[in-house]
Amino acid sequence: MKRIVKGAAPSDLLKYRLTKGATYADYRPKESLKKSLLIEQGYICCFCMQRISESNMEVAHWEPIDVNPSRQLDYKNHLASCGGNRGQPLRLQHCNPRQGNIVLTINPADPHRNCEDSIKYRNNGEIYSDNEDIHNDLSNTLNLNMQPLVKNRQNTLITVVQELNKLFPNKTWSRSEIEKRISEWSSKNTNGHYGEYCQFVIYHLRKRR
């Protein structure tokens, strides 16, 4: 999970909110909202950090609509999530579909609490937190430790490690190269994209400083 810095809401969303009886379901088209969220998040899922696009993303509500309808059109409550295997059995779902109407403890868009400070990763690709409630969010509510996601994170790190080991055959990476890689993974590329599973890679690179 990567911290999200929220920007201004799309103008058409702000205009629609003034409509009497406005609801998220009736707000259309949603293209400008999706585009705004994708740009904000560097085209990665707000929860699992896999690559997303307008065609395969969902607009997640951190505070679910059924829990607090008053925030259904609040841009600060909107996040871009992957499809999370919607329609599959619950055990195979993750991210937005898996969350359902559960209110999360952790919020990647919280301006007062950086979610990255509460999340840790094991070498095998698992995500966890020392905070019991947050760990429950990650592992159970969002199902971020389902095997395909764990494997994807692990494979991404393996690729980075292999690249560095080619540069440093003795496997003693230079501090400057590590810092360079951290900077690259912390930044959007020329297409405005963050790398998939970027925080997982950054977490382990920082441990090698």
Which residues are covered by each model-predicted region?
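Catalytic micro-motifs at enzyme active sites that drive phosphoryl/nucleotidyl and oxygen chemistry
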Residues: 34, 49, 66-71, 105-109
